[in-house]
Amino acid sequence: MTCKIDYQPAADLLHGRIILVTGAGDGIGRAAALAFAGHGATVILLGRTIAKLEKVYDEIEAAGGPQPAIFPLNVEGATLKDYHDMAETLDKEFGRLDGLLHNAGMLGRITPFEQYNPELWEQVMQVNINGPIWMTQALLPLLKASPDASVVFTSSSVGRRGRAYWGAYAVSKFATEGFVQVLADEVEHLGTLRVNSLNPGATRTAMRKAAYPGEDPLALRTPEEIMPTYLWLMGPDSQGHNGEPFDAQPPKQG
């Protein structure tokens, strides 16, 4: 796996780019939205909680970034029509999309498969894989309209090597890795669109705390500290990389 945690982006790396971030209200999504805007991008903040999105919007404006846009959407309940309506709105507003970060995710439960609830399984699959792929399908014309577009799907170490009790979350991330390879191969001939996966690694987030309640959060990197790889993937320096798995930080030891 390739990791770009030491990448030093130019201040105007993403100048003029339009980038959509899902799950932009907190955690890694918030950090990515702020980082992208801080390097010149117009960021579309997508999430289900408007108050959180508004707070990130205000933070971007206060920092002097380009005016962002807010798009409230709950991926868990969204339909194909919702995604196509969204694409139509974005087309009218922006005419293209230069970046798409699929960050929104759902952990489900860490439990033996024998005890896994089928309804919860379906929910996790909807948020982590079905929603992102149909959203991507709806947004493909906008991504193809860009001279240089990057799509990043969030993966996980348990989506590259399965581990006991990780259930639907692990399976959804294996599916994510597979879909990235399929779509990347389909768009390879375009030369203007790349699709890659990114494993954030052990990061100080609410999801990490839910998965590892006994872990000391201060021993983990913050979302802000893992942004270099996100910036590298969204910017022009990652051109030529397509269908590849990346890590946002070196693997945690021990």
Predicted regions span which residues?
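Conserved glycine-rich cofactor-binding loop
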Residues: 18, 23-27
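Conserved glycine-rich Rossmann-like NAD(P)H-binding loop of the short-chain dehydrogenase/reductase
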Residues: 41-55
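Substrate-binding pocket helix/loop in short-chain dehydrogenase/reductase
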Residues: 86, 111-113, 117-122
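Active-site helix of classical SDR
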Residues: 136, 172
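Residue(s) in the substrate-gating loop at a strand-loop-helix junction
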Residues: 156
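Active-site-adjacent segment of SDR/Rossmann-fold oxidoreductases
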Residues: 161, 182-193
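C-terminal helical subdomain
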Residues: 193, 197-198, 205, 213-254
